[in-house]
Amino acid sequence: MKQVHWIGTGLSSLPGIRRLAVNLENLTIWNRTLEKAENSISHVNKSNVKAKQFDIDLIFKEVNPGDIVISQLPATRHPEIAKLCLKHKCHFASTSYLNPEIFALDKDVKQQDLVFINEIGLDPGIDHFFSHLLVQDLKKLTSNNIEVIYESYCGGF
């Protein structure tokens, strides 16, 4: 697998970062402060999971075609990141709603055979995704025939 670059380590990022850090071979976490990036992967003892201080110019010197960039930055930054992903032939994912600036990239994204995924935010995206992971983990610990009922409040169970 190519390198995955996760930008931003806010509270809603931590479950995703931790899951990827355990399961991926090539992960770099970028954050405004290096300390927060390091804390987000402090439980992982893998030399191929790195933490770096976010710098827009630096990250796009390190990406390679086919890499995946996940942006958890504020929505106003996503068009800038998406355009740079297109320029560097990287796949892009964000939690933000599809806006006109990102939508305008669609033709070029398709022509370059890239994947840009948006609107995978808390509801329904990440919240539902981590709900499935929670149930999957529970089933590993118990019988697969159990019934799981719970309520989710934006990631809080």
Regions found by a protein language model. Name each.
Residues 24-41:
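NAD(P)-binding Rossmann-fold cofactor-contacting core
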Residues 114-157:
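Rossmann-like dinucleotide-binding core of oxidoreductases
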Residues 12-15:
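Hydrophobic/small residue at the entry helix of a nucleotide-binding pocket
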Residues 67-72, 92-94:
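N-terminal Rossmann-like NAD(P) cofactor-binding module of classical short-chain dehydrogenase/reductase
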Residues 45-58:
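Rossmann-fold cofactor-recognition segment
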Residues 84-102:
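ADP-ribose/adenylate-binding Rossmann-like module
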Residues 4-9:
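Conserved N-terminal Rossmann-fold NAD(P)-binding element of oxidoreductases
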Residues 96-118:
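Rossmann-fold NAD(P)-binding glycine/threonine-rich loop
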